[in-house]
Amino acid sequence: MKTRLALPCLLGSLLLSSAVHAASALVPPKGYYAALEIRKGEAQACQAVPEPYTGELVFRSKYEGSDSARSTLNKKAEKAFRAKTKPITEIERGVSRMVMRYMEKGRLRRAGMRPGLLDAWAEDDALLSTEYNHTGKSMRKWALGSLAGAYLRLKFSTSQPLAAYPEQAKRIEAWFAKVGDQVIKDWSDLPLKQINNHSYWAAWSVMAAGVATNRRPLFDWAVEQFHIAAKQVDPRGFLANELKRRQRALAYHNYSLPPLMMIAAFAQANGVDLRGDNDGALGRLAGNVLAGVEDPEPFAERAGEDQDMEDLETDAKFSWLEPYCALYACSPALRERKAEMGPFKNFRLGGDVTRIFDPQEKPSKSTVGNAD
C-alpha cells in the first residue's frame, strides 16, 4: 500500500499542488521544484497557531522621533512595535521554519494531525484591514512575502506535498490574492521621492503571491515596480532615496537588494530578463554595495556621514547573493565568500534561499535568519 505524504501541522491546509502547469502559467526558479527528503522517524511537534491578526494595522515605528533620515532607533517605540506585531512575526517565522524543516526532513504522516497555520489566517481574512499607517502597511507586505515565499516551495515541489488539501486550497489562494491586491493599493502611485526599499519589498511580496496564485496582474505589477527601481539607480550604483538614511545609507542599499534580486530571478524564470534595465542597474547596484562593504568611504562621501557597519556584519543580510550568483557570473572569489557566509536563511524571502538557488551547498539546521 502506498504511503501518503502530508505536511506535519503547519500547512496541513494549503493549496492543492499540480504537477503539470500550463505553458502560460507563472512559475518560480527551478530550485522550488526540489523533492522532499523522505525519512522515517518521529514527527515534529505541532506549533501553536498565532491568533489571526484581523485588527487595524496601526503600529508605532521603531524610528519614532527620529529626524528625516529615519536612522536612529527608538528603543521604547521598538519594544511597543515588537509586542503588537508579535502574532504576525510569529506566523512569518513559524511557517518559514516549518517549511524548511519539512523540505529537509519530510516525515510520514502522523495520524490525527490538525490543520495548520495559514488556513486559520486565510479563513479570518487576516492582514486585510484598511485602517493602517505606514508601519502597518509595511508589516502587511513583509508578511505576504514571507508566507507566499515559503508556500512556493511546497506548491511547486515535485513531491506534491499539498495534493491532499483541495478544500483549503481555494481559501488560501484567495487570501494570498486579496492581500496581494491590497499591497498593490498600498504602494501604487507614490511620488518618486517616496519610492525606496519599502516599495521594492512590496513588489517582491506581490511577485511571490502572483506566482503562488498564478495571477498575471500581480506579476506584471511587481515587474513594473522593478523598472521604477532600476531607473532610480544612478550611474555609480547609488540610490538617492537610500542615501537619505545618512549613516545607514550603505546598510539600506544592501537591504534594497534582496527583494530586487528575487524579483529578477522570478521574472527570469518566466522569460523576462530584467538585468539590462537602465544599463544594468541591478548589477551596478550590487557591485557598488559589495565595493562599499570593503571601502565605505564613497558612501560616506555621498551620504555625508561615516557609515554604520553593524548591520553589515550579519551574514544573513547578504542572502541576496544567492539569486545574484544565479543571475550573474559571479567570480570564484565571490562564490567562495558566499559559501563561507551561507547557508542563507531569510524568512522574509521564504526561508532557505541557499537551498533554492545553490542546492549543492551543504545544508545546516533549520534556523531562520534575521530579516530586519
UniProtKB/Swiss-Prot annotation:
Monovalent cations such as potassium and sodium enhance activity, as well as a combined action of these cations with magnesium. However, other cations like calcium, cobalt, manganese and zinc, or the presence of EDTA, do not affect the enzymatic activity. Residues 1-22 form the signal peptide. This is Alginate lyase. It is found in: Periplasm. GO terms for cellular component: periplasmic space. Its EC number is 4.2.2.3. Substrate binds at S61, K62, H134, T135, Y252. Catalyzes the depolymerization of alginate by cleaving the beta-1,4 glycosidic bond between two adjacent sugar residues via a beta-elimination mechanism. Degrades deacetylated polymannuronate alginate more efficiently than non-deacetylated polyM. Is able to degrade its own alginate, but at a lower efficiency than that produced from M.pyriferia and P.aeruginosa. May serve to degrade mislocalized alginate that is trapped in the periplasmic space. One of its GO terms (biological process) is alginic acid catabolic process. It catalyses: Eliminative cleavage of alginate to give oligosaccharides with 4-deoxy-alpha-L-erythro-hex-4-enuronosyl groups at their non-reducing ends and beta-D-mannuronate at their reducing end. The keyword Ribosomal protein does not apply. Optimum pH is 7.5. The keyword S-adenosyl-L-methionine does not apply. HAMAP family: Alginate_lyase. Belongs to the polysaccharide lyase 5 family. GO terms for molecular function: poly(beta-D-mannuronate) lyase activity.
